[in-house]
């Protein structure tokens, strides 16, 4: 199955406004040195009707690990690292929620290729295993939640319907 992200650049922006909710921290986060589990987003921000498609983080610190917990199940502890110049296959530059990214550091992406319904909570965590505190800027980490309607709209678009 192809990644859902491969289709995003061709989707009219009205679909994004109607079906996509982007969440981001409002202030920089300081992650203390040592292995910690720091919750980045409170669970009440998640759309219970929806699914989690992607988490992205801009960081050049290899000692920082990001992971997601859905319904108490830890998933995707190993993020895919995209190099700064390429963004190959993900069309990062075409995604409006990443529009303020520059080319410093690395972009880490968790790509969930299939719909993952959830009944309870979704958490994004950070472990900092380095000996220094890490600061994540307020534009650094985004949670993008697509509701079920987005997938119907996407299917219609792929089938030639507007």
Residue ranges of predicted features:
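Beta-strand-centric surfaces of beta-sandwich/beta-rich domains
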Residues: 2-162
């Amino acid at each position: 199955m192809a990644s859902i992200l491969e289709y995003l650049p061709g989707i009219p922006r009205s679909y994004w406004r109607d079906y996509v909710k982007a969440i981001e921290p409002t202030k920089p986060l300081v992650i203390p040195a040592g292995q910690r589990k720091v919750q980045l987003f409170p669970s009440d921000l998640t759309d219970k009707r929806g699914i989690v498609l992607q988490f992205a983080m801009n960081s050049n610190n290899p000692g920082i690990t990001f992971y997601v917990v859905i319904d108490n199940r830890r998933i995707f502890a190993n993020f895919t690292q995209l190099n700064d110049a390429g963004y190959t296959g993900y069309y990062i530059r075409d995604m409006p929620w990443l529009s303020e990214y520059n080319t410093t550091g690395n972009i880490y992406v968790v790509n969930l290729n299939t719909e993952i319904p959830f009944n309870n909570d979704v958490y994004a965590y950070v472990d900092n295993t380095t000996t220094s505190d890490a600061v994540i800027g307020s534009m650094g980490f985004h949670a993008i939640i697509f509701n079920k309607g987005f997938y119907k709209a996407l299917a219609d678009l792929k089938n030639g319907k507007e």
